[in-house]
Regions:
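Domain-level signal for Mg2+-assisted phosphodiester chemistry and nucleotide/NA-binding surfaces
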Residues: 2-134, 143-148, 155
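Active-site glycine-rich loop that binds ribose-phosphate moieties when present
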Residues: 153-162
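Short, intrinsically disordered, charge-balanced linker/junction segments flanking boundaries
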Residues: 165-167
Length: 167
């Protein structure tokens, strides 16, 4: 079958992946993996999804939406120390993972950015409840009671633009 005949009888299919959601869900379902193995897993998953569910479709492209990791220094309010995010395992893992995805032929990375002003620590839900109920005191707050919040910018907009251009 010629390429023209193939395309006439098969539909081009684009897969859009919310990177932050995918990474969190994949880690929960399939455990921790190296960046190379996680990227290969995503590629295989996309191809398998089309093959198993839609025999008359072929992959046009996988659009992967995420933000590059931020290498900012952040002040920890409990320890008083400054943490260089660029030196964390998460930063290294994410950098390698995005590089792995870049080398996949059918993948297009759509990168947003991380807001420099929106990187901060906040109190997790459970310790907040305990504080409000009087079961925990401010002095008893530990490093594990905090979560580092990092806000993405521009990812949702890129998804919307791609959806409208693919339609």
């Amino acid at each position: 079958m010629s390429k023209r005949d193939f395309e006439k009888h098969h539909l081009k299919t684009a897969i859009l992946v919310d990177g932050g959601f995918y990474r969190k869900r994949a880690k929960y379902l399939w455990g921790e993996k190296t960046p190379a193995k996680r990227a290969e897993e995503l590629k295989d998953y996309c191809y398998r999804h089309l093959k198993d569910n839609y025999e008359n479709r072929y992959l046009y492209r996988v659009f992967y939406y995420d933000c590059p990791p931020i290498g900012k220094n952040v002040h920890n309010p409990i320890t008083g120390k400054t943490i260089s995010l660029e030196k964390t395992d998460e930063y290294q893992w994410m950098t390698e993972f995005l590089n792995e995805l870049k080398h996949n032929r059918k993948f297009a990375l759509r990168m947003g950015r991380i807001s420099d002003t929106q990187v901060r620590y906040s109190l997790k839900a459970e310790p907040t409840k305990l504080l409000l109920n009087g079961k925990k005191k401010i002095e008893d707050i530990e490093i594990t009671d905090l979560a580092l919040n990092i806000e993405q910018k521009g990812v949702d907009m890129r998804i919307g633009i791609d959806i409208s251009s693919l339609a």
